[in-house]
């Protein structure tokens, strides 16, 4: 997206097509169908995921990734790459005593960062952890820094492999 002469933000053609598809799927009641044209993915198998971070290497990567992720997010905010104008309803998040499911439409790649920042602003940040359910391809296909974050920042990747999903469900029950 870029800003035009009139101050309006111009959206890229692929994003406009996704918006159109969202409207179409909403009319048809298809709320469980992905509107994105995602590339083919590498299947996540049980031996390639440690959902509960039981291995020492997984624990260390988790700590390091979350520390890096926190610095990355703080830098985005400091440099106005991400601007959070206001937060409504944080008192509801503060009332959560067990677990909660927070959804994010993830239309913008920074949507998840906003959810992360609001969670850190809440009273729950001290004694709870925010887990992110992510799509299989985000876990298996992404290289570099974002890939490292996707694999290690308290993420719970879905999988097209049934055995992996059994482990996913067990991990969710444990968490």
Q: At which residue positions do the language-model features occur?
A:
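Membrane-interfacial terminal anchoring regions of lipid-handling membrane enzymes
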Residues: 1-100, 108, 173-174
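Soluble catalytic domains of membrane acyltransferases
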Residues: 80-175
């Amino acid at each position: 997206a870029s800003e035009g002469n009139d101050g309006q933000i111009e959206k890229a053609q692929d994003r406009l097509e996704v918006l159109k598809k969202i409207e179409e799927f909403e009319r048809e009641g298809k709320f469980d169908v992905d509107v994105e044209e995602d590339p083919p993915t590498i299947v996540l198998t049980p031996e390639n995921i440690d959902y509960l971070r039981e291995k020492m290497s997984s624990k260390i990567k988790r700590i390091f990734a979350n520390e890096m992720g926190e610095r990355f997010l703080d830098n985005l905010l400091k440099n106005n790459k991400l601007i959070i104008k206001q937060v409504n309803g944080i008192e509801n998040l503060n009332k959560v005593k067990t677990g909660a499911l927070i959804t994010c439409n993830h239309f913008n790649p920074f949507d998840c960062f906003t959810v992360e920042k609001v969670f850190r602003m809440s009273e729950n940040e001290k004694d709870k952890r925010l887990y992110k359910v992510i799509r299989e391809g985000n876990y298996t296909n992404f290289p570099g820094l974002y890939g490292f974050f996707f694999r290690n920042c308290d993420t719970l990747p879905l999988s097209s492999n049934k055995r992996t999903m059994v482990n996913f469900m067990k991990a969710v029950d444990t968490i």
